[in-house]
Amino acid sequence: MQSDSRQAHWEGVYTKKGENEVSWFQENPAPSLELIAHVGATPASAIIDVGGGASRLVDNLVDRGFEDVTVLDLSVAVLAAAKARLGSRAAQVQWIVADATVWEPVKAYDVWHDRAAFHFLTEECDRAAYVARLDRAIKVGGYIIIATFALDGPERCSGLPVVRYDPARLGEILGNSFQLIDTRHHTHATPWGSDQSFQFSVFRRMSGGRS
């Protein structure tokens, strides 16, 4: 899918549906928060939530005193909703409207978090473009936390096909500069009560990249 088409799709989703009317909504992003703590992130760590949308991860990070938080999403509408929810706290966050496959990072991050964005990239060229941006944006010693549908997870979401992953396949895509350090399976309950199987994979950058 081309970047313009991808953006149009998600603008349509977020202008028609409320925050808790999408399957990936979480009142409490506990798995992500646990892994961010697990990798040793501190309030001074630079964290980017890629495809963050209206996720409440940003609220929790700000409330915990994190001072360098960025949320990237290609939907203007969903970031506006997130800012409105945060109120005055929104000023403590860097907001980027961009497609992660064409965005050009201007700084380096300690933690790259992506829950339920990467698995929508079904074409190899888009995955390669995403990884190229990630490669330029993560410090040596930094961490990548990616949550995708697991191998037994859904094959489609929000009207689009997805790619399901296990940690080994993600490692192949990321390349030898990244070392797998943790994996966790998570069963997510959608707002309407169905279960979705997610795979959280955590990688550390061992070489290359920014310092």
Model-predicted regions and their roles:
Residues 116-120:
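Short catalytic micro-motifs in class I SAM-dependent methyltransferases
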